[in-house]
Amino acid sequence: VLAATNYDLDGSVSGKKRRIDPALLRRFDNRIYVDLPNEEERKQYLELKLNQKGKNKISEDIISNLAARTTGQSIAILQNVIELAMRNAAKAGTELSGERLLDALEEYNYGEKKTWEQGYYESVAIHESGHAYAAWCAGEKPSYVTIVSRGNFGGYMQHENSENKPNYSREDLLGKIRTSLAGRAAEKVFFGREASLNTGASSDLRSATDMAMRVIATYGMDEENLVCLSPEQILNTTLAKEFIERTNRLLKEQMKETENLICSGREKVEALAKKLLEQNHLTQNEIQDIFDET
């Protein structure tokens, strides 16, 4: 019997509702696990598919960027992105371009573009440039940054994938916290405290809080604690108040460092934001060029 499935064999990832019946599994003599493609394999597929369609004029930079930004995605998704880009190009009566491919990946993952007033884009450009600069300073090269609004976000920064990194140090995780806090920190540095207090940083604060709590309670990286507990477990114990206070203390310390970081790199953040307002999005090489030249 030969078969293929995307379902979990034991339900450990998706839960028992997606588990294959053990009675069926017993009929197979052998099981072959096929992982999702890594970055190099995604790049090879994109090159092959575009060449097959006669679209071999797409730049190496665009193909590498798409491959780097699709960690954890299947070949089928990459094919869907290419097809979407080609349909959009046909509707517009233009040739398939790198810009169309980048836009198609955004549309496939997050939906149609939304339009807002200019003042909003200026704020988002500073916010996302802050994220990109903090990630760059932490050694996680930003691979893409955009101020185009889709879904439930106004823009976003995506850093270089970490497929080949087996573990993280405490400083690595603090760098991630600073990167999450850098959007609000940049708005505060450029526009003042009151203007920075908006709902745009809510998901960033959730991410920073979760990471800070894991540094303190889960990964054994706090001087006062070696107990390994998840954030959910902590909140259900008598230690909740203590851990929340320590988490908040760590976040405040990192926010102060992040504000200092943005102040010291103000010219780079401003230059990146200016370019974002001109182009709406930037790839890794474009971001690196701006930071190198400023």
What are these regions, as identified by a protein language model?
Residues 1-34, 40-43:
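Canonical AAA+ ATPase core
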Residues 5, 28, 42, 74, ...:
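Conserved RecA-like P-loop NTPase ATPase core
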Residues 6-11, 36-42, 52, 73, ...:
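Conserved nucleotide-binding/hydrolysis micro-motifs of P-loop NTPases
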Residues 19, 23-27, 45-49, 81-84, ...:
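Alpha-helical scaffold elements adjacent to nucleotide-binding pockets in ATP/GTP-utilizing enzyme cores
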Residues 22-26, 59-61, 114:
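Short, flexible turn/loop "capping" segments at secondary-structure junctions
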Residues 34-100, 183-188, 192, 218-228:
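Conserved C-terminal "switch" segment of AAA+ ATPases
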Residues 107-108:
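Terminal C-lobe "cap" of eukaryotic-type protein kinase domains
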Residues 115, 120-126, 132-294:
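Soluble catalytic regions of large protease machineries
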